Amino acid sequence: MNLRPEEISSIIQEQIKRYENKLEVKDVGTVIQVGDAIARIHGLEKCMAGELLEFPGGVYGMALNLEEDNVGCVLLGSDDKIKEGDTVKRTGRIVEVPVGEALLGRVVNSLGQPIDGKGPIQTDKYRDIERVAPGIIARKSVHEPLQTGIKAIDSMIPIGRGQRELIIGDRQTGKTAIAIDTIINQKHSDVICIYVAIGQKKSTVSQIQDTLEKNGAMEYTIIVASTASELAPLQYIAPYAGCAMGEEFMENGKHVLIIYDDLSKHAVAYRAMSLLLRRPPGREAYPGDVFYLHSRLLERAAKLSDERGGGSLTALPLIETQAGDVSAYIPTNVISITDGQIFLESELFYSGVRPAVNPGISVSRVGGNAQIKAMKKVAGTLRLELAQYRELAAFAQFGSELDKETQARLAQGERIIEMLKQPQFKPMPVEEQVMMIYAITNKYLTDIEVVEIGPFESQFISYMVGHHAEVGQAIRDNGVLDQASETTLKEAIEAFKKQFKAERE
């Protein structure tokens, strides 16, 4: 093929016209120090706070300290293959996690990656883990109940959808048990549950997954696990990741329950990270912003207004105390952020009162508005009667001469305490709770022995379901105990009591 010189020049001119000078500018930095899941990077002058940074070998980090001549970054993976002099690239993104229906029934890590061996999660939706909490206009007051299925809580410390209720107590007092029971109790409601395990043993998380699967609760639950063997930065982001997953459902008009188990370990992970980043320590060596650490997380729990879809995110944070000391730094912080707290006591737990809730110092600041009318009606005097019982029981130890009224109050208190006991993983439907509490508060069980209260309850509920199912149905459907239902309930209690006593003789 022969080309004339003028043709060659026209081809070259055409090529020059088509040439695009594409210059790709990348902001890169250099690792100057690495160790303990912390890296210091020189360069990256335009780096954002909380930005995701890419290290060699596919490891990512999060920029937390933006200093004059370097960036302090926490690593979200192993630092084994990262060395001094390595190149670090900016991604321009904040840490994000996958969200949506595909996560239901799965166990994921802090970054939303599956760790249950059930294959990849098919979703194309992602959300930033840090998000500004809904404003005042976007919210609505808490008015719908979130039933835990635990008599002591639903009757005296009611929780509403969109509330933050702290569960606080020493180790081994049944904090996680209350949280798991609450998840199991959502089986017949429309609530999606998220359980965030922070700094727990892998065996414990596996046990919880097994319990939820056995009770058919895993199908509407997501477990976000950042176990004790994981790096502090991964434990730090776990609750925010779980919250982002919950917000996706909340903003689509659904109701979500999220459990943070527990925030004491979360604060410890943040303290370790902050000290390694050379941030100045404050009280108990925690950094100055440890209050903000938890407040920005718990403020994201909300009941959205009808214009925003009316969804809700209810948070149950757990805090572990040391020898019952609730005046320590982290417990007082979280108590002041939440809308109430459920105190669990070791003394009660070891004396056989389980769940070991102390109703005297437990409180729900907004849940009363959410309690169903039937429960409000029957449980109104419960807290007062228990308080009177505790006061009288303390005096009764000293004197044997007690008048009849005092003896009656002590007997009533003993029966209430016995009735509030409940086995683990056996949450009770609210209509059954109402019927049993009605029988106790209206003094129908004064002639039943304290040890017989448990058997009486289980047989009485079976009797009501078999003979008067309409009473439970009415309470469940309307949330009220009307005149007709109350009359039927009174007659049923009297009839069953005769039958129960006859069988015992």
From Swiss-Prot:
Q: Subunit details for this protein?
A: F-type ATPases have 2 components, CF(1) - the catalytic core - and CF(0) - the membrane proton channel. CF(1) has five subunits: alpha(3), beta(3), gamma(1), delta(1), epsilon(1). CF(0) has three main subunits: a(1), b(2) and c(9-12). The alpha and beta chains form an alternating ring which encloses part of the gamma chain. CF(1) is attached to CF(0) by a central stalk formed by the gamma and epsilon chains, while a peripheral stalk is formed by the delta and b chains.
Q: What is its EC number?
A: 7.1.2.2
Mind listing the GO molecular function terms for this protein? ADP binding; ATP binding; proton-transporting ATP synthase activity, rotational mechanism
- Membrane topology note: Peripheral membrane protein
Q: What class of enzyme is it?
A: translocase
Taxonomic source organism? Alkaliphilus metalliredigens (strain QYMF)
- Its catalytic activity? ATP + H2O + 4 H(+)(in) = ADP + phosphate + 5 H(+)(out)
Q: Where does ATP bind?
A: G169, D170, R171, Q172, T173, G174, K175, T176
Name the family: Belongs to the ATPase alpha/beta chains family.
Q: Which UniProt keywords apply?
A: ATP synthesis, ATP-binding, Cell membrane, CF(1), Hydrogen ion transport, Ion transport, Membrane, Nucleotide-binding, Translocase, Transport
Report what the protein is called.
Answer: ATP synthase subunit alpha
What job does this protein perform? Produces ATP from ADP in the presence of a proton gradient across the membrane. The alpha chain is a regulatory subunit.
